[in-house]
């Protein structure tokens, strides 16, 4: 997993409540066994019409949000089935951060394991960020994990917290496999002793 300390990026506002994993990555795209290649299918049914043409009214199809790497969502973001493919698609599309008032628990954990920083903040803060991004497409924020701040050049400043374990994993670039590999010598010693 790529380490995360400070990230500056364009904000894409998608403040809809109860965005579920079926909307994030529809089931017909779940046949891959790799973690990559899901980005083109992110929000597929919202991004494209039945003929496969981009819907111009969907935020990620609008020019001001091209290259966005910070997604702002509504409450209960990532609800539904527990598929890991949803944060894989978000990460593969280019998002490093998702900000919402609440997340489904399993989705939140899957984000950590996928290298997507899921930040919980108040609805008021989400609305303030979304309003700025909607008014000024291309609006950028800086997320500083070490300081626990979200800031904009316009003076917006929001403090946030993530649990210590998640913070450590992101700062050090450790997913579950990376954490396990830190104990490779102890594991090898145990296996030798119990062979």
Swiss-Prot record:
Record keywords: Amino-acid biosynthesis, Branched-chain amino acid biosynthesis, Leucine biosynthesis, Lyase
Q: Which GO terms describe its cellular component?
A: 3-isopropylmalate dehydratase complex
Q: Which SUPFAM superfamilies match?
A: LeuD/IlvD-like
Pathway noted in the entry: Amino-acid biosynthesis; L-leucine biosynthesis; L-leucine from 3-methyl-2-oxobutanoate: step 2/4
EC numbers, comma separated = 4.2.1.33
Q: Name one GO molecular function term.
A: 3-isopropylmalate dehydratase activity
Q: Which reaction does it catalyse?
A: (2R,3S)-3-isopropylmalate = (2S)-2-isopropylmalate
Q: Which GO terms describe its biological process?
A: L-leucine biosynthetic process
Q: What class of enzyme is it?
A: lyase
Please name the NCBIfam families in this protein's record.
leuD, PRK01641.1
Sequence similarity: Belongs to the LeuD family. LeuD type 1 subfamily.
| Quaternary structure and partners | Heterodimer of LeuC and LeuD.
Primary role? Catalyzes the isomerization between 2-isopropylmalate and 3-isopropylmalate, via the formation of 2-isopropylmaleate.
Q: Specify the protein name.
A: 3-isopropylmalate dehydratase small subunit
- Organism (species): Koribacter versatilis (strain Ellin345)
